[in-house]
Swiss-Prot record:
HAMAP family: MscL
Species, as recorded: Anoxybacillus flavithermus (strain DSM 21510 / WK1)
GO cellular component, one term: plasma membrane
Designated name of the protein: Large-conductance mechanosensitive channel
Function description: Channel that opens in response to stretch forces in the membrane lipid bilayer. May participate in the regulation of osmotic pressure changes within the cell.
Protein family per UniProt: Belongs to the MscL family.
Record GO terms (molecular function): mechanosensitive monoatomic ion channel activity
Key words of the record: Cell membrane, Ion channel, Ion transport, Membrane, Transmembrane, Transmembrane helix, Transport
The gene coding this protein: mscL
Segments traversing the membrane: 8-28, 30-50, 67-87
Pfam family, any one: MscL
Subunit (UniProt): Homopentamer.
Location relative to the cell: Cell membrane
Membrane topology annotation: Multi-pass membrane protein
Length: 131
């Protein structure tokens, strides 16, 4: 069982996934800071100095913190848009590489007429070279 686990854990896909999760977590922190420390204060300033983190409703004893929810929604939208742009960039790069490979692989094929003309040219060259 230990051998199976080692084989599973060392495979490239698992390691790639782990790296992706770690980078994703770090990216999430960066985006959260961007939203909480830059975007939302600017939006609050534009809307008249509102601090979104403190917005809430009192319903009896409960406090509904809709300001924090709004920040989380903006956080999600920024992350989703960033991922969209990244995936779009990767797709464009993939298409470019694919087109380059296709153009390399599709060597121009000569028609019968072109083949005959090439043979005639080569024969004429041979005749000129031999006295």
């Amino acid at each position: 069982m230990w051998q199976e686990f080692k084989k599973f854990a060392v495979r490239g896909n698992v390691i790639d996934l782990a790296v992706g999760v770690i980078i994703g977590g770090a990216f999430g922190k960066i985006v959260s800071s961007l939203v909480n420390d830059i975007i939302m204060p600017l939006v609050g300033l534009i809307l008249g100095g509102i601090d979104f983190s403190g917005l809430s409703w009192k319903v009896g004893e409960a406090e509904v913190k809709y300001g924090a929810f709004l920040q989380t929604v903006v956080d999600f939208l920024v992350i989703a848009f960033s991922i969209f742009l990244f995936v779009k960039l990767l797709n464009n790069l993939h298409e470019r590489i694919k087109k380059q490979e296709e153009t390399k692989q599709t060597a121009p094929t000569m028609t019968k007429e072109q083949q005959l003309l090439t043979e005639i040219r080569d024969l004429l060259k041979q005749q000129k070279e031999t006295p």
